[in-house]
Amino acid sequence: MMATYEGRYTDAQALRIAVVVARFNDLVTGKLLSGCLDCLARHGVDTSSNSDQLDVAWVPGAFELPIVTQTLALSGQYEVVITLGAVIRGDTPHFDVVVAEASKGIASVSRETGVPVIFGVLTTDTMQQALERAGIKSNLGWSYGLQALEMGSLMGVLRSATSAS
């Protein structure tokens, strides 16, 4: 018989979540973080300053996201890690280098640790595009929060299913 595995948004109280936020372009990343925290709070995650369920780490920029994400994932304290950043194209190839290394690094953390890592790094051509995605039109931070809840729950379901068989 075929098994179907899905994560739910209602298992939030059982999750420990880390959010790693790039400070560079903090006008954008701060809005992403606000949207993310709003989503998590509305789904039952304690987002208060004395929360035992959520930690937020700030890094200088998107390039530094992978190393801190890896450290948190390897700690064994979190079911899911969310990364938030904003890389905006400029006049030099720097954009391409930062985006490539951040995305490869973040993806490898998830594969190597088995901890879901949500890729919440905006890559846009202009500040206007980034702001539109961080709250002017919609806030993708909310979506990243939902993805974290779903993946954290799904991994719990999968671990239970595979340990029972």
UniProtKB/Swiss-Prot annotation:
Q: Which pathway does UniProt place it in?
A: Cofactor biosynthesis; riboflavin biosynthesis; riboflavin from 2-hydroxy-3-oxobutyl phosphate and 5-amino-6-(D-ribitylamino)uracil: step 1/2
Query: Which family would the database say this protein is a member of?
Result: Belongs to the DMRL synthase family.
Write out the GO MF terms: 6,7-dimethyl-8-ribityllumazine synthase activity
Q: What class of enzyme is it?
A: transferase
Protein name, per record: 6,7-dimethyl-8-ribityllumazine synthase
Catalytic site positions: 94
What keywords tag this UniProt record?
Riboflavin biosynthesis, Transferase
Positions that bind (2S)-2-hydroxy-3-oxobutyl phosphate: 91-92, 133
What EC number(s) are associated with this protein in UniProt?
2.5.1.78
Name the species this protein comes from.
Prochlorococcus marinus (strain MIT 9303)
Q: Which reaction does it catalyse?
A: (2S)-2-hydroxy-3-oxobutyl phosphate + 5-amino-6-(D-ribitylamino)uracil = 6,7-dimethyl-8-(1-D-ribityl)lumazine + phosphate + 2 H2O + H(+)
